């Protein structure tokens, strides 16, 4: 049976994100992936500060200065017969919920681990998020050109700490100065490493067969013997790769390599296009939408300001779930019940924009947004439904924000509300006074907000500490009890950027006591967009 042209396009798509701890090499891998997909001609190695060659995927002012990727960029490139969409997530102090929400827009993740360090804190957090949807995970053990931990230990650590089985696909031969290459367990081939070829794709010498004398000649008898001994252990002790278990999120295929040395990334990409799922179905509040449906649907998972410093614009990122986008199409924005004509959607190669003529499930579109689109918005061809599972998280850090120039209160509020719609930060306005409280998931978000208020809204703001430990969204089915709760707790209540009522607790003890005192009121840690 041959697939229709539409279904062929759907089957070609692979949409994934990279998750890692800061400095495990995510930006470098992103570049090398693009290099293998021929999307960039030479990879700009991630830079020392002040160098002119910025990595392709870091593009807001502050990112350029700090050498970190703050915002989620989207890059599409061809690989073999597939079209791959890579969503880049912020790496540092995991900037914000942006990262978590980006993971709701992908069908698969690549986990990058620094093989000298093993599983680190941020990786654990991000893995918990992927677990909510049983997202399939591929693993890349990076930095083999440095001295690394014992590979068996690394696999054990991933299995024990992240509760996912490991199925090694390739296995390293030596490491650091003695790194010679990797052996492919399923192809029975050894790929030999040459140093210093980071910017170009190198011709790799391949030795067929584990017992081939050429292998001993190429890597030395000691390392060849060590490889054979290790493989006996590995094959006895680790999982075999099984595609069904991979798709269920129960085992992860593991690849070894060095992104900086441009080695091993293509083995992982081969696995990604062979095994990762084509665009998956999604839940809405009324039914499940399949990618094979020809009517268009999509949801907004992120809003980003100023992708173009020359224009004060904001772009909403939409993941296409079903149907084909065509230029000039009329779509229903379900939340406000309005039909909008979308004629100038964008596709990205981080920061380079080009207008799209068409897009298919799995693709990410950029919609120009003048404040009318919010995170979580669903677009359809008329059907009234809403995609679920795009979360807002209660912030963990709070500061009061105030102006150096009190006359700019209006600009400050506008800036904060826009930044909160974008998911860069959350803003709370206490009911009983005129304070503005900013809530964030990571410390760096506070700096980002002040920098962006200054550069985009021309507002100079400073922070003060504030007596808030945590926040919860509150609601109740019992109107009478809710009124009483609101009356008695007025000093602890605030409205967030979307005017949702929030309880801001000075201490965790206070929160627990208040929850006990008002059993009819729900205190929520997350809120659906």
Swiss-Prot record:
Limits of the tr-type G domain: 11-280
Record InterPro entries: EF-G-like_DII, EFG_III/V, G_TR_CS, P-loop_NTPase, PrfC, RF3_C, RF3_dom_3_sf, RF3_GTP-bd
GO molecular function: GTP binding; GTPase activity; guanosine tetraphosphate binding; translation release factor activity, codon nonspecific; translation release factor activity, codon specific
GO BP: any one term: regulation of translational termination
GO CC annotation: cytosol
Cellular compartment(s): Cytoplasm
Binding site for GTP: 20-27, 88-92, 142-145
Pfam family, one: GTP_EFTU
Domain of life: Bacteria
Keyword terms, alphabetized: Cytoplasm, GTP-binding, Nucleotide-binding, Protein biosynthesis
Family: Belongs to the TRAFAC class translation factor GTPase superfamily. Classic translation factor GTPase family. PrfC subfamily.
Function: Increases the formation of ribosomal termination complexes and stimulates activities of RF-1 and RF-2. It binds guanine nucleotides and has strong preference for UGA stop codons. It may interact directly with the ribosome. The stimulation of RF-1 and RF-2 is significantly reduced by GTP and GDP, but not by GMP.
NCBIfam families named in the record: prfC, PRK00741.1, small_GTP
Identification of the protein by name: Peptide chain release factor 3
């Amino acid at each position: 049976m041959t697939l229709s042209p539409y279904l062929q396009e759907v089957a070609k798509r692979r949409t994934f994100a990279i998750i890692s701890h800061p400095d495990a090499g995510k930006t470098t891998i992103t570049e090398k992936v693009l290099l293998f997909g021929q999307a960039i001609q030479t990879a700009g190695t991630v830079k020392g500060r002040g160098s002119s060659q910025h990595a392709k995927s870091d593009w807001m002012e502050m990112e350029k200065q700090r050498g970190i990727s703050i915002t989620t960029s989207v890059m599409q490139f061809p690989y073999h017969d597939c079209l791959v969409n890579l969503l880049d997530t912020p790496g540092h102090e995991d900037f914000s919920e942006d990262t978590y929400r980006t993971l709701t827009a992908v069908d698969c993740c690549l986990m990058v681990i620094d093989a000298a360090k093993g599983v680190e804190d941020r990786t654990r957090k991000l893995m918990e998020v992927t677990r909510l949807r049983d997202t399939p995970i591929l693993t890349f053990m990076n930095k083999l050109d440095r001295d690394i931990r014992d590979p068996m230990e690394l696999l054990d650590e991933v299995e024990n700490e992240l509760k996912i089985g490991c199925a090694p696909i390739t296995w390293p031969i030596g490491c650091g100065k003695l790194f010679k290459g990797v052996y492919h367990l399923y192809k029975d081939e050894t790929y030999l490493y040459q140093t210093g070829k980071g910017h170009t794709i190198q011709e790799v010498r391949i030795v067929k067969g584990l017992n081939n004398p050429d292998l001993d000649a190429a890597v030395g008898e000691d390392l060849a013997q060590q490889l054979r001994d290790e493989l006996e252990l590995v094959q006895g002790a680790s999982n075999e790769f099984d595609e069904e278990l991979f798709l269920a999120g129960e085992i992860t295929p593991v690849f070894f390599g060095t992104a900086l040395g441009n080695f091993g990334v293509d083995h992982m990409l081969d696995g990604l296009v062979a095994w990762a799922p084509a665009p998956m179905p999604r839940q809405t509040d009324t039914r499940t939408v399949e990618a094979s449906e020809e009517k268009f649907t999509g949801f907004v998972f992120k809003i980003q300001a100023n992708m173009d410093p020359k224009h004060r614009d904001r772009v909403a990122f939409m993941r296409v779930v079903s149907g084909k986008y065509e230029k000039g199409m009329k779509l229903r924005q379900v939340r406000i019940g309005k039909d909008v004509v979308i004629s100038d959607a964008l596709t990205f190669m981080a920061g380079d924009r080009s207008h799209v003529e068409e897009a298919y499930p799995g693709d990410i579109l950029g919609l120009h947004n003048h404040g009318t689109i919010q995170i979580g918005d669903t677009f359809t061809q008329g059907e009234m439904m809403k995609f679920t599972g795009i979360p807002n998280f209660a912030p963990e850090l709070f500061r009061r924000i105030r102006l150096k120039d009190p006359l700019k209160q209006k600009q400050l509020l506008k800036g904060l509300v826009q930044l909160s719609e974008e998911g860069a930060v959350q803003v709370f306005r206490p009911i009983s006074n005129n304070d503005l409280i900013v809530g964030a998931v990571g410390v760096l978000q506070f700096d980002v907000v002040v920098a962006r208020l200054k550069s985009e809204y021309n507002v100079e703001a400073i922070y003060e500490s504030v007596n808030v430990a945590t926040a919860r969204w509150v609601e109740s089915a019992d109107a009478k009890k809710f009124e009483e709760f609101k009356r008695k707790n007025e000093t602890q209540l605030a409205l967030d950027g979307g005017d949702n009522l929030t309880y801001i607790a000075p201490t965790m003890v206070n929160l627990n006591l208040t929850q006990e005192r008002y059993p009819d009121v729900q205190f929520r840690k997350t809120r659906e967009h």
